[in-house]
Amino acid sequence: MNYLIIPAYQPDLNLVKLVRLVHAKSDLNIIVVDDGSDADKKVIFDKFEGLATVLTHEHNQGKGQALKTAYAYILERGTYGSIVTADADGQHKIWDIFRVVKQSQEHPGALILGARAFSGKVPLRSAFGNKLTRFLFKQQTGVAVSDTQTGLRAFTTN
């Protein structure tokens, strides 16, 4: 069983478009984690009935905890397959989501990272953070990656 996890805090209609498109074009089990969004965003999460499983945090706990909540949900089911994470803002193209799923299936045990094409001006804080984490990641693993902060990731559960 393959999963798409989308952590969401204060999402807009881009999330609805993404969920509907992925549901229509794939057999991925979609999990959306509402990470403590305001009450007015409930109308967005209500649109996922029959399309996705919605897990809810009462208060914002951050993207990392939202991912852990979804991982725990999958672990409770005891199923094996691929897990893909994508951002709720619609920045990841659907074919890129499917591409990283395929790569994770072809390379079990590997971490597949989508890489963003940076164009234009990147905020100094973001550029510094990505540069620092790329350096630390390479020091720790010996593997060079171009974008450690990408929200598009895939790996297998086994």
Where does each model-flagged region fall?
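Acidic helix N-cap motif at the loop->helix transition within catalytic regions
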Residues: 14-17, 38-47
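A conserved acidic beta->alpha catalytic loop
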Residues: 34-42, 90-91
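A conserved hydrophobic helix/loop-capping motif in glycosyltransferases and polysaccharide synthases
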Residues: 2-11, 18
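Acceptor/aglycone-binding surface of glycosyltransferases and processive sugar-polymer synthases
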Residues: 59, 65-73, 94-158
